[in-house]
From Swiss-Prot:
InterPro entries: AAA+_ATPase, ATPase_AAA_core, DNA_pol3_clamp-load_cplx_C, DNA_Rep/Repair_Clamp_Loader, P-loop_NTPase, Rep_factorC_C, RFC_lid. PANTHER family: REPLICATION FACTOR C / DNA POLYMERASE III GAMMA-TAU SUBUNIT (PTHR11669), REPLICATION FACTOR C SUBUNIT 5 (PTHR11669:SF9). Keywords: ATP-binding, DNA replication, Nucleotide-binding, Nucleus. One of its GO terms (biological process) is DNA-templated DNA replication. GO terms for cellular component: Ctf18 RFC-like complex; DNA replication factor C complex. This is Replication factor C subunit 5. ATP binds at G59, P60, P61, G62, T63, G64, K65, T66. Subunit of the RFC complex, an heteropentameric complex consisting of a large subunit RFC1 and four small subunits RFC2, RFC3, RFC4 and RFC5; the RFC complex interacts with PCNA. Forms an heterotetrameric complex with RFC2, RFC3 and RFC4; this complex has ATPase activity but is not stimulated by PCNA. The heterotetramer of subunits RFC2, RFC3, RFC4 and RFC5 interacts with RAD17. It comes from the Eukaryota. Subunit of the replication factor C (RFC) complex which acts during elongation of primed DNA templates by DNA polymerases delta and epsilon, and is necessary for ATP-dependent loading of proliferating cell nuclear antigen (PCNA) onto primed DNA. The lineage of its organism: Eukaryota, Metazoa, Chordata, Craniata, Vertebrata. It comes from Mus musculus. Belongs to the activator 1 small subunits family. It is found in: Nucleus. The gene is Rfc5.
Length: 339
């Protein structure tokens, strides 16, 4: 028995080592979660008083919605009963009414013999469900409230029908602040012995925009690809344009003739694999920072909005890049005319 123990431990250690960091460092208890303390304290009170209602957790990706309800489930149920008491589904896998009539209905309608209390159905990405499926789910929730609690998780509250919203207690999870993200990222960096610079950490936080899942994925990918996490390697790994690239692009659009600007930007896009949508996002931030005359800023933002829309419906990047350069060159002429 003692000789076999190390060989039994090795597969478990290997599994932990091969796990994505998002799962490896997922909070296991409510106390491990780093934000939304007001929401967590309310849910903790529901659990301690055995009055957990149906829940609707909504907000941007990577803000702790799924981690929160999984931590609740682990507090409510022991490991051996978890599988029989908790049903976790991703509604985007099967968005139709069959998922409600099939696994959800059969799980909610059966009672457990040896365990008192309610079962828990966790429905992730519930905003992907069709309206018919949501209406069917409403009837299931009404019928089996006595022995089952439902937790719906979504990014967009507006895509959940009012009848479902009214049957749940709603909690909004906002994006995480840098002050909350940095200590948790530093913990992962220390545990994984990651070589990271200060500007690399800032780039991680900036690009993730309050999404902890995205921050951890970028951190792991950059570390594996380059062995060192700096601002440049983070931007290169994600295919996002560097600040110096944006500065060059803006300089070309405002100061060079059309042909030269187009040639230089196309060469840079090809060399670094940049997407025009990412360039447009960074240039948009620049427009708000610079003190343009109001009429000039309005003209430029309107043109950029049109370009973004046309990109979203699948038009040619080359044509839209031409349109972006033209918009900036017209802007340059307007500034000169108003001077």
């Amino acid at each position: 028995m003692t000789a076999a123990a190390p060989s039994q431990q090795r597969p478990a250690a290997a599994r932990a080592r091969n796990l994505p960091w998002v799962e490896k460092y997922r909070p296991q208890t409510l106390a491990d979660l780093i934000s939304h303390q007001d929401i967590l304290s309310t849910i903790q009170k529901f659990i301690s008083e055995d009055r957990l209602p149906h829940l609707l957790l909504y907000g941007p990706p990577g803000t702790g919605k799924t981690s929160t309800i999984l931590a609740c489930a682990k507090q409510l149920y022991k490991d051996k009963e978890f599988g029989s008491m908790v049903l976790e589904l991703n509604a985007s896998d099967d968005r139709g009414i069959d998922i409600v009539r099939g696994p959800i209905l059969s799980f909610a309608s059966t009672r457990t013999i040896f365990k008192k209390g309610f079962k828990l159905v966790i429905l992730d990405e519930a905003d992907a469900m069709t309206q018919d499926a949501q209406n069917a789910l409403r009837r299931v929730i009404e019928k089996f409230t006595e022995n089952t609690r439902f937790c719906l998780i979504c990014n967009y509250l507006s895509k959940i029908i009012p009848a479902l919203q009214s049957r749940c207690t709603r909690f909004r999870f906002g994006p995480l602040t840098p002050e909350l993200m940095v200590p948790r990222l530093e913990h992962v960096v220390q545990e994984e012995n990651v070589d990271i610079s200060e500007d690399g950490m800032k780039a991680l936080v900036t690009l993730s925009s309050g999404d902890m899942r995205r921050a951890l994925n970028i951190l792991q990918s950059t570390n594996m690809a380059f062995g060192k996490v700096t601002e440049e390697t983070v931007y290169t790994c994600t295919g996002h344009p560097l600040k110096t690239d944006i500065a060059n692009i803006l300089d070309w659009m405002l100061n060079q003739d059309f042909t030269t600007a187009y040639k230089n930007i196309m060469e840079l896009k090809t060399l670094k694999g940049l997407a025009l949508h990412d360039i447009l996002t960074e240039v948009h931030l620049f427009v708000h920072r610079v003190d343009f005359p109001s009429s000039v800023r309005i003209h430029l933002l309107t043109k950029m909005a049109d370009i973004e829309y046309r990109l979203s419906v699948g038009t040619s990047e080359k044509i839209q890049l031409s349109s972006l350069i033209a918009a900036f060159q017209v802007t340059r002429d307007l500034i000169v005319a108003e001077a």
